Amino acid sequence: DCQREITIDTHANILYRNGNWKEYDLLKLNLTSFFTLQQMITKVDPRYSHFLTSILNSNNEIPETIKILSWNYDTQLEMAYGKIIKSDDIYSVLDKMKIHSKFLAVSHSNTNPNIFKLNGSIFYYYANGFRKFYLNSGLTENLNQSNLERLIDNHNNYFDLISKEKMDYSSALSYAFEEEKKEDQYIHK
């Protein structure tokens, strides 16, 4: 069906409007896996590191006076920041960068986000809270057999869970047309 539409976003919008949650969640899973694999292949664009190092203060924080809007699904900003602070831990990077998106809020202690990801990110989060789950578990940018196998295993496991409607977490990808999901739209175990 996606081949008949002009863009993947149009196809996603049609699935969303028709309440085809299973197909919609599978599309988001496929996009998440694609972008994760693409990042493993192409690595971090050096422009992100250059941009961040030009705005970070001496504590490697984005100043409160700077707000960033991003419509990218990928985690290039997060990966570049992780490289700067020498951290592969996605949880600490998200909190330190003060990232907010429709479905992936900054930690409760952070009330003044610096980065607003308008289309979300290639993450999964648990339906009942703020626990973030990264498809590839870290910010690694290396394509090796172990990481590729983990990505494929995770993709296949999530695909099975979504297909069986037994998944209790949801994609952090979002579209402008998408409202926050209601409790009955989540797929629960």
Feature locations, PLM:
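Conserved catalytic alpha/beta core of Sir2/sirtuin-type deacylases, generalized to analogous enzyme cores
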Residues: 1-189
